[in-house]
Amino acid sequence: MNLTDEEIRIKVAEAMGWTNITAFHFEDVVTGKPKILHKGDCPTLEIEDQWLPNYPESLNACAEFEATLTDHDTMRMHHNITKILRQMKDPRPAWRSPAKVRCLAYLKTKGLIP
């Protein structure tokens, strides 16, 4: 399953409890390329009408969902990171995995993607 960064961002946000997610399309002032950002509410974090974290590109944002995992899920996620890195033929250890890989492993650990 190949998900875009936007799809990953929304799936992770929904798994974290974000609701009322709305997309905003605009042109990046620096690059001139089209860009999409999302706003939403997150009752579990007591957040209303805020920009969603950029989970696929930010290790700091990944720390939010990693902090919610049980010890068992943390071990499962580590295993899933290793599997994803091997599929990508990426030799780095799991603890150095990029944010996008962590997001995919989180979604897999939560049973939200195969």
Q: Which residues fall in each region the model found?
A:
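Glycine-rich anion-binding surface patch
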Residues: 1-114
